[in-house]
Amino acid sequence: MNFSRILFFMFACFVALASVSAVPEPRWKVFKKIEKVGRHIRDGVIKAGPAITVVGQATALGK
């Protein structure tokens, strides 16, 4: 019986420590998601820039 109390106490302490995080999560995660989408769009435009230039030059040669 004493062992089960000790085991229960250790389990309760483990659950309490596991549920506490050192860094609090921001309340406005929506803005972080919007920022992430904007970053992806910006990176896509930067990567597509040289390809768009080549296509523009190819159409200029075709005229």
Swiss-Prot record:
Principal localisation: secreted
GO terms under cellular component: extracellular region
Propeptide: 23-26
Domain of life: Eukaryota
Keyword Signal applies: yes
Signal peptide start-end: 1-22
Short name of one Pfam family: Cecropin
UniProt record, GO biological process: antibacterial humoral response; defense response to Gram-positive bacterium; innate immune response
Record localization: Secreted
Residues found modified as Leucine amide: 61
Protein family per UniProt: Belongs to the cecropin family.
Role description: Has antibacterial activity.
Protein name: Hyphancin-3G
